[in-house]
Amino acid sequence: MSAATKKIETFFTIDMPYRERMEIRRTVFVGGDAPRVAVVAGVHGDELEGLYVCHRLAVWLDELQRTSPDSLLGNIELYPAINTLGLDTLTRGLPVFDTDLNRAFPGSAGGPLPERLAAALMTALSGSALVVDIHASNIYLREIPQVRINQEFDDLLVPIARRMNLDLIWLHGAATVLETTVAHSLNSCGTPCLVAEMGVGMRITPHYCDQLVAGILNVWKDLGVLAPDVSVPEASHVPLIADDSNVHYLNAQTSGMFIPAASHWTDVRCGEVLGTIVSPFQGDILSEVRSPVDGVLFTLREYPLVYEGSLMARVMGRKGGRS
């Protein structure tokens, strides 16, 4: 078997109005004939966690090529910046088209730019042994590292997700799943795709990223992409399981400033004050935010200003403490 190589490829290109040309690239680590896997990031332009994960994976793979090039048995593709225009402008969607790119799949090769890009990505990813689509939260909320799975595909994906070294597996019912996402489109056509979400928009949380990197490397080793004797970081996190029946949404009862009283990713008790909503114009507390159940606080508001109905937290109800 020949030693592993690395190359940068352009998988999508289109002419822009002012004699410019947009090119979307991927980094490919070429090994042997074992399975092909991929990591996708930057579908939303305000989500940067996945870009750093791709960097950390590239660092690890560069070192593997230097020290043990024969240990890469398959091919690894990193797609760190799908929505380049959104990333350039700190815009969640695709600028000009005002489109959420993750609502354009599976796309159309003859459609407008969002659909063409979606179709090109589908073509590039189809047939992979596993795709990991990495997202951050928006700028308003902080999420613990988690995998989100449509229950339609849970038999296939949950066993893989358990090895991803994340803290939560959130199973979504079919009624709450958007079918125009890259993950749903890939899973529907037989290419396994996990959605990982963590952190907060427009920020990087390095320890979350390293946690996910360890999980991805362990899964790649399980799939035979990496040699059995390769040393990978320990995957020490055991995920909790959440579904639509035990996830509780806490929405603001009034507008104001949300001041958290509980720490993110901690055990909370039923009735415990998780935060308060106050007014900058007076000294009164406008509203207390209390946990409806015993559970774990896995989503917490990062941006303090809230309107009535704004999401402030999510609690996963369960018995006992967090292990």
Give each language-model segment a name.
Residues 1-323:
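Structured catalytic-domain cores with a bias toward divalent-metal coordination
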